[in-house]
């Protein structure tokens, strides 16, 4: 599904290279995790895949479903089925939650949205993720707590039906109950859409108690330095990076 080939990425308009010839291959139905110390490029990786304007691909390729998307704009990548659950979701004043999702869904599917069914489905889904239905008519993420913003990202995921999901520190700002509910919704989505693949960016293995990974990768110095299974994340939690031979 997603292949990163010798991907090097820098901060736009600088010489600050963050990712250096990084390689990663994620197949259909797989859950991959990126872990690593602060400042190693984990969030840069997620934004580079999504096509964030603050980063430039210096060399290498981003291949999605056998198509080179390296030079595509963010909206074009979203239409192809890539979704980024952001670490700090953007506030958009004057655009309601329902208006945003209805427009985004119509853009991605190319179909006109039935308003009555949409509102009914959205109210049900908001209940599933633990959001009050009054937030349906509020400006996107305006006045939302950190946890509410993350729940709103999961709500968007359910409605936009992506093929590839990037969870950039979903567990940051969520209490135990909220994290469990968010992960239950993501797991249910993956069960209903079994070819969906997920890339989890995280510092801590807590989220992996709810979403079970196939592979855990350690990112350091712009490259993946080590790959393992869930036990690798447990080992890092217990002993730190130095104990597995990575000098953080």
Q: What function would you assign to each model-found segment?
A:
Residues 84, 88, 94-109, 118-121:
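Q-loop/switch helix immediately C-terminal to the Walker
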């Amino acid at each position: 599904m997603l292949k990163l080939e010798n991907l090097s990425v820098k901060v736009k308009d600088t010489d600050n290279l963050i990712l250096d010839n990084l390689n990663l291959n994620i197949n259909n139905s797989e859950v991959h995790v990126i872990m690593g110390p602060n400042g190693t490029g984990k969030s840069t990786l997620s934004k580079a895949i999504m096509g964030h304007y603050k980063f430039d691909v210096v060399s290498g390729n981003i291949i999605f479903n056998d198509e080179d998307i390296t030079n595509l704009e963010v909206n074009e990548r979203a239409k192809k089925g890539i979704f980024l659950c952001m670490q700090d979701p953007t506030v958009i004043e004057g655009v309601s939650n329902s208006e945003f999702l209805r427009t985004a869904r119509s853009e991605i599917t190319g179909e006109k949205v039935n308003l009555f069914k949409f509102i009914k489905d959205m109210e049900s889904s908001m209940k599933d993720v633990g959001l009050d239905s009054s937030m349906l008519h509020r400006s996107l993420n305006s006045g939302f707590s950190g946890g509410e913003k993350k729940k709103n990202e999961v709500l968007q995921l359910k409605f936009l039906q992506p093929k590839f999901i990037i969870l950039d520190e979903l567990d940051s700002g969520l209490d135990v109950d909220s994290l469990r509910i968010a992960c239950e919704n993501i797991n249910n989505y993956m069960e209903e859409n079994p070819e969906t693949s997920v890339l989890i960016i995280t510092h801590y293995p807590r989220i992996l108690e709810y979403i079970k990974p196939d592979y855990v990768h350690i990112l350091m110095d712009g490259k993946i330095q080590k790959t393992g299974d869930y036990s690798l994340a447990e080992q890092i939690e217990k002993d730190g990076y130095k104990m597995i031979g990575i000098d953080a």
